[in-house]
Amino acid sequence: MPLAKRIIPCLDVDKGRVVKGVQFVDIRDAGDPVEVAKKYNEQGADEITFLDITASHEARETTINTVEKIAAEVFIPLTVGGGIRTLDDIRNMLNAGADKVSINSAAVKDPDFVRIAAEKFGSQCIVVAIDAKRVSADGEPGRWEIFTHGGRNPTGIDAVEWAVRMTEYGAGEILLTSMDRDGTKDGFDLGVTRAISEAVRVPVIASGGVGNLQHLVDGVIKGGADAVLAASIFHFGEYTVPEAKAYMEQHGIEVRL
């Protein structure tokens, strides 16, 4: 029996507020993180992802306090990312109520960190986040590079090769964001989503670019994703999680209703 595909609302948190930008800039306020998380919990989201989008860039600790408040109100898996640099950071997040942590910049700086973290805490709670940007010209075979620090720093690392390496190091899940599509509402970058989904044996979460419910379906059917993550379509009331699940089910995708 195929595993149900997951719908994951994403809370990008900046200075204690949920925000949403376009291609990592042009930020718009979307509310209080605890209230927003409660709303998605009540709507039947499968999981929630909380990304402190300023943490890595400004090199400060993720707001443990907010995570504790969300975890007290939300009874679905919670992934927390942003500024996770040490084993203590992971331990603190898990103790605050996170089920998984998402590691991005720190993995690139020290890939062994992922291996050690997976050995210590278990692969099931280590998510490696990849912010990928297409670097091949139109008409050429797809090639994507990973960027770190909230999409600010190019690395020269091939996104597909990196995803494979990170799963070999023990990542239990890949959270893949297309920087080209982030906030654009043009749909996922299905090329990189499929390339990584086919290359790794762990679940891939597609992120970046959802503008309508068909995009969620495409992420699963054309992109091969195991889960689809979206922010603005849910934050600003265009669609609810139940509407998204009903639409996916109508298109032959198994979801938890």
From Swiss-Prot:
It comes from the Bacteria. Pathway: Amino-acid biosynthesis; L-histidine biosynthesis; L-histidine from 5-phospho-alpha-D-ribose 1-diphosphate: step 5/9. Keywords: Amino-acid biosynthesis, Cytoplasm, Histidine biosynthesis, Lyase. One of its GO terms (biological process) is L-histidine biosynthetic process. The active site is at residues 12, 131. It catalyses: 5-[(5-phospho-1-deoxy-D-ribulos-1-ylimino)methylamino]-1-(5-phospho-beta-D-ribosyl)imidazole-4-carboxamide + L-glutamine = D-erythro-1-(imidazol-4-yl)glycerol 3-phosphate + 5-amino-1-(5-phospho-beta-D-ribosyl)imidazole-4-carboxamide + L-glutamate + H(+). It holds the Pfam family His_biosynth. Its EC number is 4.3.2.10. The keyword Amino-acid biosynthesis applies. Signal peptide: none annotated. GO terms for cellular component: cytoplasm. It is found in: Cytoplasm. GO terms for molecular function: imidazoleglycerol-phosphate synthase activity; lyase activity. NCBIfam families: hisF. Heterodimer of HisH and HisF. Belongs to the HisA/HisF family. IGPS catalyzes the conversion of PRFAR and glutamine to IGP, AICAR and glutamate. The HisF subunit catalyzes the cyclization activity that produces IGP and AICAR from PRFAR using the ammonia provided by the HisH subunit. HAMAP family: HisF. This is Imidazole glycerol phosphate synthase subunit HisF. It comes from Teredinibacter turnerae (strain ATCC 39867 / T7901). The lineage of its organism: Bacteria, Pseudomonadati, Pseudomonadota, Gammaproteobacteria, Cellvibrionales.
